[in-house]
Amino acid sequence: MLTLASKLKRDDGLKGSRTAATASDSTRRVSVRDKLLVKEVAELEANLPCTCKVHFPDPNKLHCFQLTVTPDEGYYQGGKFQFETEVPDAYNMVPPKVKCLTKIWHPNITETGEICLSLLREHSIDGTGWAPTRTLKDVVWGLNSLFTDLLNFDDPLNIEAAEHHLRDKEDFRNKVDDYIKRYAR
């Protein structure tokens, strides 16, 4: 699956040889991001939560992938939520960009797909934002946890959803179920 990994190995074997000098720029120049991603994707695939699946539309572009989260407990159980992740060139100094593609009624995800997850913030006052020591595995586990233990009604991005939960938990659950039936199957 990791065709980029085989390219990197091939390029490492060419270093120092005359062939490397004549190789095209595209085979000689591999970004720091891409080298990191080869290792991180392998680690991610080996440690993926059972409620998550990762899909790489183009195995040569590890910096663009889709994540499917299928919660097995809580309000969102039975739903199938799609996320799109793009890892910028400046990775790992900056976090990946993640968007929820599935319309959802959630206090930490807007209906347009914006996500409130501290580790996706480039700068954070409390120190819980992105750091170069974080990996894609942290991002995936964090997104997965937004449906369970990181579900946060006290610091919402979607204030309307949080207030709805505070006002009427049963009606909130009904709206979540309705969104799952309409958008998350």
From Swiss-Prot:
GO cellular component terms listed in the entry, alphabetical order: cytosol; nucleus
Organism: Homo sapiens (Human)
Catalysed conversion reaction: [E1 NEDD8-activating enzyme]-S-[NEDD8 protein]-yl-L-cysteine + [E2 NEDD8-conjugating enzyme]-L-cysteine = [E1 NEDD8-activating enzyme]-L-cysteine + [E2 NEDD8-conjugating enzyme]-S-[NEDD8-protein]-yl-L-cysteine
Residues spanning the signal sequence: none
Active-site residues from the entry: 116 (glycyl thioester intermediate)
Tissue/organ expression: Widely expressed (at protein level).
Family membership: Belongs to the ubiquitin-conjugating enzyme family. UBE2F subfamily.
Positions of region (Interaction with UBA3): 1-29
EC id: 2.3.2.34
Subunit structure: Interacts with UBA3 and RBX2. Interacts (N-terminally acetylated form) with (via DCUN1 domain) DCUN1D1, DCUN1D2, DCUN1D3, DCUN1D4 and DCUN1D5.
Ranges for domain UBC core: 32-185
GO-annotated biological processes: post-translational protein modification; protein neddylation
Originating gene: UBE2F
Pathway per the UniProt entry: Protein modification; protein neddylation
Residues with the N-acetylmethionine modification: 1
Name by which UniProt lists this protein: NEDD8-conjugating enzyme UBE2F
Function: Accepts the ubiquitin-like protein NEDD8 from the UBA3-NAE1 E1 complex and catalyzes its covalent attachment to other proteins. Together with the E3 ubiquitin ligase RNF7/RBX2, specifically neddylates cullin-5 (CUL5). Does not neddylate CUL1, CUL2, CUL3, CUL4A or CUL4B. Mediates neddylation of the CUL9-RBX1 complex. (Microbial infection) Following infection by HIV-1 virus, participates to HIV-1 Vif protein-mediated ubiquitination and degradation of APOBEC3G by mediating neddylation of cullin-5 (CUL5).
Post-translational modification: The acetylation of Met-1 increases affinity for DCUN1D3 by about 2 orders of magnitude and is crucial for NEDD8 transfer to cullins.
PROSITE patterns the record matches: UBC_1, UBC_2
GO molecular function: ATP binding; NEDD8 conjugating enzyme activity; NEDD8 ligase activity; NEDD8 transferase activity
Keywords (A to Z) from UniProt: Acetylation, ATP-binding, Nucleotide-binding, Transferase, Ubl conjugation pathway
